[in-house]
Amino acid sequence: MNKPVKMEPGVKLRDAAKMALIPVKVLPTEKNEMLRKPEWLKIRLPKSTERIEGIKQAMRKHGLHSVCEEASCPNLSECFNHGTATFMILGAICTRRCPFCDVAHGRPLTPDATEPEKLALTIKDMKLSYVVITSVDRDDLRDGGAQHFADCIREIRKHSPNITIEILVPDFRGRMDRALEILIETPPDVFNHNLETAPRLYKLARPGADYKWSLELLRRFKEAHPEIKTKSGLMVGLGEEISEIEEVLRDLRAHNVDMLTVGQYLQPSKHHLPVKRYVPPAEFDALKAYADEIGFTHAASGPFVRSSYHADQQAAGKEVK
């Protein structure tokens, strides 16, 4: 039997070190085993990086994190170049160790009580009209970090009263009652929680998470605030069948979820789960058509779509691919 790994607070475990701790063994994918990216997945970099560097400097100045950087999002250059970013609160170390995700695992530090104000002032300085706030999983906190979300929402509204706030929350495992009590009292404008994949793949891709629990979180928030949009996201290319994704879409609608994002899974490193298939654009279009047909108010479906990709346009009902 392996001895438990002693984790020091604040130390980030990534790639092989992180994968060594998950219950399902993931073998490294050698370069010759990786699927070749198709032409539709080639990213065009912007000519100027001035705006990108400006946002990175603003983050560093206030000790803030973006999920764009921490999760190695392929859209970072495009979003930063347009002056948008998804802020990640509660540190950059996650208590979970999902093998599709590039965010570091480890023992997080105590939440920074000054972060809500620093975040609000940064958002005000950036003159944002729409902001997405997400977090790592914080299973070490009694409320899963919900109060910190609420504090951030309150501070942002104080400094930017006309802003639209979307929060992308973890599942608050074992703490749903307390977390919802807090967030129902201090709600965002859009409540987002990602199901990520089909339930058959949860043990592989989302160890520690529960499909029905996540659906219930979305349902209960919507029940308390029917006027607020709820949203969820999925990735494809992990070995799921399209019929399984369609079933997830039906489950989301049955739980009154309004908005949907579907994007291609991209392997962050050779130590993460391998890409089983690159889904062609036509299949993304078909998933969007199906989502529209079954009643989503907005569905963004495309290879580069992520939860917060052009989130302002998604919320406004504009087509995003």
UniProtKB/Swiss-Prot annotation:
This is Lipoyl synthase. CDD domains: Radical_SAM (cd01335). PROSITE patterns: RADICAL_SAM. It holds the Pfam family Radical_SAM. One of its GO terms (molecular function) is lipoate synthase activity. It comes from the Bacteria. Residues 80-297 form the Radical SAM core domain.
